[in-house]
Regions:
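Conserved SAM/SAH cofactor-binding pocket of Class I
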Residues: 60, 64-145
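Active-site beta-alpha loop architecture of Rossmann-like, nucleotide-cofactor-dependent enzymes
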Residues: 47, 63, 159
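A short, charged helix-loop
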Residues: 52-58
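Conserved beta-strand segments of alpha/beta enzyme cores
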Residues: 10-12, 39, 108, 133-135, ...
Length: 218
């Protein structure tokens, strides 16, 4: 291209000082607090006296609490009784939701993600938060065959949720709870129809900047 007379390319360059990008990232990574009860922070943040203090090293994984969907799922978890509830965190990302579920008394807990980075990061974060009841798996909804849960948390996206909805319903115990997020307000009708047509009952929802987190019971 450089030798082709039909192309004219102008460019400039400059030297920049060597930068510690981890340090720069840390400067811009802020801890968050949800409903005055749950504090989510990175390892370099000071610990607080929050009722639930979660330490997350996100690396390449989704789930620091900053995104609207994670924030709303935390809200759902905070107002739900998880004591001795067998729980599934589907599409666990950093395992932040599984960690909070254990802090609220859930056990045992399965955390599943199809992404290898998320799988490894979830193991690290579970250990970092001294979790004893979380088992992390790399895979998809095919791992759910024969499983049964009292509570299922699935923060993924519209298409995957719709595709896997029957598996969620099949492994949800009677009177079990299904939390869904990862989609927009305009997706509520199709998500709700998929759930109710399979025997679930709508309970409530949170909305935040056009994102939604729904709660259903079986």
């Amino acid at each position: 291209i450089l030798d082709n007379p039909e192309f004219k390319i102008n460019y400039t360059f400059e030297e920049i000082e060597q930068v510690n990008w981890n340090e720069e990232w840390e400067k811009n990574f802020e801890a968050i607090e949800v409903d005055g009860k749950c504090h989510v922070r990175a390892p370099f943040h000071e610990k607080t006296n929050a009722e639930y203090d979660i330490v997350i090293e996100p690396k390449m994984s989704f789930g620091t609490g900053h995104h609207e969907t994670t924030h709303m799922m935390i809200q759902h978890i905070l107002e739900t009784d998880f004591s001795n509830k067998k729980t599934l965190d589907m599409g666990c990302g950093t395992a932040i939701l599984a960690i909070l579920a254990e802090m609220k008394g859930a056990q045992p807990i399965d955390a599943i993600d199809i992404d290898n980075w998320c799988y490894l990061n979830s193991i690290e974060n579970a250990e970092r938060n001294n979790c004893k009841h979380i088992s992390v798996y790399e895979g998809d909804a095919s791992l759910l065959v024969g499983k049964k849960y009292d509570i299922i948390i699935a923060n993924i996206n519209r298409n995957i949720l719709l595709n896997d909805m029957q598996q969620y319903v099949d492994c949800l115990n009677d009177n079990g709870i299904l939390f869904l997020s990862g989609f927009y307000t305009e997706d509520i009708p199709v998500i709700s129809e998929s759930c109710t047509s399979k025997g679930l009952t709508y309970v409530k929802q949170f909305e935040r900047n056009n994102w939604v987190a729904l709660k259903f019971v079986k």
